[in-house]
Regions:
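PDZ/PDZ-like groove recognition
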Residues: 156, 202-269, 285-292, 296-299
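Flexible, gly/ser-rich surface segments that form the specificity/activation loops bordering the active-site cleft
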Residues: 34, 56, 100-106, 111-146, ...
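Protease-domain processing segments flanking chymotrypsin-fold serine proteases, especially trypsin-like
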Residues: 1-28, 33
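Conserved active-site neighborhood of the chymotrypsin/trypsin-like protease fold
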Residues: 2-6, 30-37, 43-126, 257-260, ...
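Terminal peptide-recognition signature
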Residues: 21-26, 41, 48, 52, ...
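Interdomain regulatory linker/hinge segments that flank or connect interaction modules
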Residues: 1-6, 114, 174-221, 279-301
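Active-site region of chymotrypsin-like
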Residues: 22, 93-102, 128-185, 193-198, ...
């Protein structure tokens, strides 16, 4: 009578065991050396890279350690942070043993699918909570701007969960837990794996993220043909820019633009100092623009 429930329960236990092994608790002394700070993270690579949140390690002055399930804490160091996406990468001490990395799922999260948050909320190590993906394409406000395309979940996320993985039913990472809405129940957020996949290699290779700028501000707007479809429209532009206010961005270097993040994703480090072909819809017609890309200064709080 209960076979299916027992099978489901056993499969969940196996899933949690797999993810728990590769999830870490991160601790360190604060800048004032008054006490410990704590957060979570997870193994990203076979070289010992650990992904977590920027706000977890920001302000950790010394004694930075990572601890795997059932193991002694080992030293780690920060090798890169990106405040704008609230991501950071640590490196385990040379020669320290660590479990296999978790696999990321780059297919988008699906509204309503089961998900699991793993980490150390409120210093309760090796905790897991279950929920569903309860919202997509959310914007998480931070001191450095909004984090685009984030995942909303009703899996319990509390202080200390930050930086830990949000995984699907196969144990693949679909997001990095980052925050909860303090004024509500069961509304938590995770940085989508799509963002993690773009930012983390930059942090590993360079220690920071360089972003390009087209000299415009953009926003989502409804199409003016009466259809129930949103487009990305130019909201503000500089006097010397080839864009005009109201231009609808159709593509960047022939890649279609459907979200604000599609434009941001195109403005990566390797295009800074070059030009991009941007196709816009202006007065009902397609116009091809050749736009110089300049380096955008990092945002500050």
């Amino acid at each position: 009578m209960f076979e299916r429930l027992l099978q489901f329960s056993d499969e969940l236990v196996g899933l949690v065991d797999l993810v728990r092994e590769s999830t870490v608790t991160i601790t360190g002394m604060d800048v004032a050396l008054r006490g410990d700070m704590i957060g979570s993270g997870w193994v990203y690579s076979h070289q010992g890279h650990i992904v977590t949140n920027h706000h977890v390690v920001d302000g950790m002055a010394r004694n930075l350690n990572v601890q795997f399930a059932g193991r002694r804490a080992i030293p780690a160091r920060v090798i890169g942070t990106d405040p704008e996406t609230d991501l950071a990468v640590l490196m385990c001490a040379d020669g320290a043993p660590f479990p296999a990395p978790l696999e990321m799922r780059l297919l988008p999260a699906r509204l309503g699918e089961l998900c699991f948050a793993v980490g150390s909320p409120l210093r309760f190590r090796e905790s897991v909570s279950m929920g569903v993906v309860s919202g997509l394409s959310r914007q998480i406000p931070t001191d450095y701007g909004d984090i685009e395309e984030s995942i909303q979940t009703d899996a319990a996320i509390n202080p200390g969960n930050s930086g830990g993985p949000l995984v699907d039913c196969q144990g693949k990472v679909i997001g990095v837990n980052v925050a909860k809405l303090g004024s509500a129940d069961n509304i938590g957020f995770a940085i989508a794996a799509e963002i993690v996949a773009a930012v983390v290699p930059e942090l590993i290779n360079y220690g920071n993220v360089v972003r390009g700028h087209l000299g415009i501000s953009i926003s989502e707007a409804w199409r003016d043909d009466g259809s129930e479809q949103q487009v990305i429209s130019v909201l503000r532009t500089s006097e010397t820019s080839p864009f005009q206010v109201g231009d609808v961005i159709r593509s960047v270097n022939k890649l279609p633009v459907r979200r604000r993040y599609d434009v941001q994703r195109a403005l990566r480090r390797d295009v800074v100092g070059s030009t991009l072909q941007v196709t816009v819809v202006r007065a009902g017609s397609d116009v091809n623009l050749i736009v110089p890309v300049t380096a955008r200064p990092p945002r500050t709080p």
